Structures are given as C-alpha cells and as structure tokens.
A protein has these predicted regions:
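Nucleotidyltransferase catalytic core that binds NTPs
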Residues: 1-113
C-alpha cells in the first residue's frame, strides 16, 4: 500500500510491524506513527538475536518510550531467514503467533521494504 496523505486510508482493528530497529531512527518513528493512525491497536515486534551490538531489550525500550500508544514486543530468536524453507517459515509463524498479544489479528501488516 502506498502511503499518500491526500487519500483516505483504510482502518484496521489490529496492525503489525516487524523489524530489527537497529538502531531506531526518525524514519521508523514516522512509519510507526503512520501505521498507528490506521489501527485501533498497533503492535511492533522488535526482532533480536544474541550478540547484537545494541541489545533488543534496549531497542524495544526506546521504541516503547517514543511510542507509548503502541504495544512493543521484543522477539528474541536464533532463526535464520531462508524464506524458501517451509519448515523454517513455519517456525517463524509459530514464534510470531506466540508473541501476538491479542485474541485476533493481525488484520494488517505494515512493511517498508
């Protein structure tokens, strides 16, 4: 979906953004704010792995402080990102479902890449 300020936007019950936010920057904040305007409840998953220069807990904390109107969840994992591997993809989905804080949804996934 292309974000245009002159067009009406669809509204969703819940939305999801997934990223590393390593480190969080103004572009991330703009994106989170734009998505939050389109959702009753926006969840931001901060993916993190052991050994990263900036720990995921710190990045998640920064985002939670900057965006008190959204739910920020640290998603620690050691999974690879070979999207052609169906078993690996199933592990990612199971991980994300285990971290999802609502009974339904997400009703929209927002992506910048």
């Amino acid at each position: 979906m292309t974000y245009r300020t002159d067009q009406p936007r669809e509204h969703f019950s819940t939305g999801l953004i997934v990223g590393r936010f390593h480190p969080p920057h103004l572009g991330h904040s703009w994106f989170i704010n734009a998505a939050a305007e389109q959702c009753d409840a926006l969840v931001v998953f901060v993916n993190t792995r052991a050994g990263e220069l900036v720990p995921g807990s710190l990045r998640a904390g920064w985002l939670a402080e900057l965006h008190a109107n959204v739910t920020v969840v640290e998603v620690a994992h050691e999974l690879d990102t070979n999207w052609n591997d169906n078993e690996l993809w199933a592990k990612w989905i199971a991980l994300f479902r285990s971290k999802w804080p609502h009974n339904t949804g997400p009703h929209a996934v927002f992506s910048s890449d």
